[in-house]
Amino acid sequence: MSTHSGDSTKQQHYRSSDPYSGRRPIPTIPKFFRDRKQRAEKKEEQQREQTENEKLFDPITQRDVEINDVHFDYAKTYDDPSFTVPNQSIQGSSLPSEKPYLSSNQPTNVYKQHQDDLAPPEADNQITRDVPISDEKTNILFFPSPSIDLSYVSKEVKQKTGQYSLFAYIFSLVISWFFTHSIIISAVLPLAISSCMYLWMQNIYAVAKDAEWGAEQKRGEYARLNLIPESAEWMNHLLEKVWPLINPEMFSSVADQIEDVMQASIPSFVENVRVASLDQGSHPVRVVSIRSLPSGEASESFSEKQASEAEHKDEPEQQRKQFYNFELCLAYHAKPVEDATSTSARASNLHLRIVFYPGIKGTVGFPLPIWVEIKGFVARIRFRCELMPEVPFLKNVTFSLMGLPELNVSAVPVAEGGVNIFGLPLISKFVNDAISAAANEYVSPKSMTIDLSKTLLGDDIKKEVNALGVIFVHINRAEDLSKQDVNGLSDAYITVGFHKFGKPLYCTRVVKQDLNPIWNEYAFIPVFPDQVKAGEKISIELWDSDRFSPDDVVGRTKIGLHLLIQDSGKMHERCDTLTGISEDTSLPGRVFYEIGYFPRAEFKPSLKTSGHDITIPRSMRDDPAFQNPHGSLDNKEEEAAVTTAPDEEYPSGILSFTVHQAVNLQMNHPTGTFGNVSGNYNTSPAQSVGDVTAEEGSELPSSYVCVDLDDTLVYKTRTKVFTSNPIYNAGSEKFVKDWRNAMLCFTVRDFKLREHDSILGVVNIPLATTLTTSSQLTKWYPIQGGIGFGSVRISILFRSMKLKIPRNLLGWDIGTLEFMDRQIVAEGTGSVSDVSFSSIRVNIAGVKITAKSSTSNSSSTAEYHVRSRHAVIPVNNRYRSAVVFEFRKQLQRKHNVFAMVWLVDLEDNVEQNIRVPIFTSSKPAHVLQNMIDFDHPDKESEFKIIGYLSTRICFHRGLDDSHEQLVDNDDEAAIFETYRCLKSMGLRRGYVKDMKNPLADQRASLDESRETTTASSKFESDDSVDTEDEETTTDRTPIECTQTVSMVDPNVNGDIQGRNSLGTMNSNERNLEQEFISLGYASKNRPKAHAQEGTNQPGASENVEPVLADDSDAVTIHSNISSDDQKRKLVNADDRELEKRLHRGPYNSKIVRTGEWVKDGAKMGWRNLRRKFALNGRQPDVETEISK
């Protein structure tokens, strides 16, 4: 589908397997109003051009068609349908007889013209009439058979055949005997002549019958070509019998979609809304008409994506692809109810039961149940069926509405024990608009495709990512920008996104008061097919950040997406002049950047496996109950996705995740027994435990799911109110820099009023230890660590991109910086007095620590000591942050002596000795904000190097306890609470350590041993190695791990590591676990990081010695505290956090939790107020399926 929201009539196409996401948001009522207004404006414009109807692309017939929103009277259409039919088709017509208007004896052109005259709606009222069929249902031909009647001929021939044959026999017998007097001739000749006469007469009878049936076939062909509808009373009669037998659960997806639309469109005074049920009743929908549509042009109408796929398919497969198109007109009118207070009487019609929760957001709310009855509707739908030779003979079914359906609903409150004496017109209109907004998503040219071959098999698993590739942008710098502020400078930042889409997908940091900013930042933008179809362009916009007014556009530049795709796989260095809204308008300034498009990488055959879970014992792997579901596999790419592990050669790629549904969600309510225990033999009954006994109820959680990727919130689903089995079907696709160290966490939360949303449970998925034998996995995961119970079904899929980025860019954006030896050494180029100060203030994105001067053992250096409790500094935006060392004296507050190192130059979990210049500058703001190269500075950089600073630091990936001081909003608080939850369960040990795919190590050792064996065999005999056997071994060995592998995660505490089903480990497992426990094995063979050519590495020293960080327990802000009292306080703090999360202790009281919510709300409100007056860029929002 197109992501350009400005044109609602643009062709959009969905598949039933596509979940809701930021690219496919839930439709809302305001968006529906905008789309309807745009269609009305376009129709008025066409009418001004003497066009009757709106002409749009029909995805069914692949032609341009004229569509109209339905404005029929649904009651009249349902109760008194009438159709225009030819007079001669009506038996017993009272009209005077006349010459048939349509006859098979007419010439072809006249015959077709008369067919068109009889085809509705251009019918001639002189030769047609409207026939009501409500009183007496009948199957009527809406187009007459040609006026050819051979029944009297057939009857006459059948009667005279015997007489003529007997006459011929007697006549030939007399003649033959009179002339020959031969007994043989007189016996044979009359018999032959009479037989020929009989067969000839029978042939005339058969020809007459063929001509009569040929006329009917000809009528059907012309009726189909002229789009003539046929009566569907047989189908209505069938619906009357089948309709009450349909399971209402079949309409659950429709109810879920209506609920999503209302949830995304509710006003501010309504907190939540829930569709409790949708029932079809016993009164069926009527099929008004059905007609076949032409499909001959289907083979010539491929979309761009289908055309590209067709190039890789066999020609016979393309030739045998067939389509069948038809149009269906439906009408419904509610049956009158005699007793309006009778629930059973009202339930006979199509209805919904909706519960609104009005109130104040997060504070007050109460349920308001509403009974919604569908009074009637009229809809016209077109279907396109793709046929295939295999069972079930239907591949894809595409449907599209030919105009917005006419709909009317009524809503009344559900008053038990009372009489409903008033209706709710506002709610009726809201529900009506919500249903119309949902239907508007399928009005032509939009459409939906359902893969019936997979639906019948229950296949909803995604086995290919939607993204075609990724755009890699290196934003370097800008020069000579225009003056935007009163001081003649500019607070510049850059956003990267798609031009037509408009929404920024990446935003750089703000460089304050500078006309020549240097960012040196990197952006990764996934590219999807609809963006290629829409002719999108990559837009790089430069903005000026203002504190009290909207940001101003400094300029922009664009580059066509198709140009990058044509020259893919490499970076293009560009220097573009800024332009205005029009590309013809030139603005001051230039922007320097590199950009390139990198497509998907193919699956590597050498990584192919059986796809089995290697943690399961080998004897049980072939059991279907222990195999991962993968659905139907339609092509080699889908088969490779479920049997091929991700490629470590291309660690960067697209990660697709989908949250399908959750089951048996339940909350644990810890309460006291409120009883007395007396006597020695007093026993208490067992408590009630087990599965959930109800699917709906006020005691059940209102759940939603937050998705964290590398400790960053990337997705949030909608809230499903008061249900134990919520269906989300929501997901997204995100770019992952390094799948080997990526971690995906799903947090299921319960929406609460007047308190923080509780954690029901979490699911933590490290990709390296999860995607061991395949790139796709769909699995039920139990949630744990929270106040609830249940399971959630999750699908993940990773697809590598042909992109290799420098090692220093593969890390996480969130982590902690640690001073490993607690020492900072300053060395002066001239005299040590130039760098000898009382202290050094270390500043990282607003987090400051102080290093005091200490006694130096050398007269040429000055040493500074970092306290242990200040040795770890939390970092939230690592790739846009720098470590600034400011040299200070006690009596002077401001100094002009600095040193700095950018965190983009560091690798994750690698200790590095850094040596950076100590400088003084007349323009310190320019040097400290811009990423400059001290060896090759720009023209605006003015500094003097007076010494060098040396220290040993390490950037640890992932959250730490010290990040609590950086929490500024609710989303960050939720992420930090999830981290605390994982840590309390033993699934996190401080920072995240390097992870490794266990089969990758086995492959590496196997390849090494195979190379050794092959090399040694060459000295013995050249013919000793059989190529075929070698290939067989190469393909077979990686398929199955010879023993059960223990999936050891270095981030999990050792006491909870997994074991096999027998509780013991063999020698191979023990060796493998020891290899994983040692981080040195995971990274000791990694090559030394080198900077990418052309990138600046400011302050990078030549004698940097990367050393892998120790794998002992992660160093946190509390790791080096020696005081027993302080350690006791920290233990108590952890206990309080556990009680708070599990609602135990004092937090079991609602009043205490509400007080905590008020206190944290005030704190967050103050921080948000301060952030309002800060200079920030247009950062992308957290993705959700609810459009904003």
Curated annotation (Swiss-Prot):
Keyword Endoplasmic reticulum: yes
Domain of life: Eukaryota
Positions of modified residues (Phosphoserine): 1005
UniProt keyword terms in alphabetical order: Calcium, Cytoplasm, Cytoskeleton, Endoplasmic reticulum, Lipid transport, Lipid-binding, Meiosis, Membrane, Metal-binding, Nucleus, Phosphoprotein, Repeat, Transmembrane, Transmembrane helix, Transport
Binding annotation for Ca(2+) 3: 546, 549, 552
An example molecular function term from Gene Ontology annotations: metal ion binding
Transmembrane parts of this sequence: 173-193
Chain residues that bind Ca(2+) 1: 485, 491, 544, 546
Region named Disordered: 1-61, 83-125, 298-318, 615-639, 1002-1066
GO terms for cellular component: cortical endoplasmic reticulum; cytosol; endoplasmic reticulum; endoplasmic reticulum membrane; nuclear membrane; nucleus; plasma membrane; spindle pole body
Binding site for Ca(2+) 2: 485, 544, 546, 552
Record-linked Gene3D superfamilies: C2 domain
Stored PANTHER family: MEIOTICALLY UP-REGULATED GENE 190 PROTEIN (PTHR47348:SF3)
Protein name, UniProt field: Meiotically up-regulated gene 190 protein
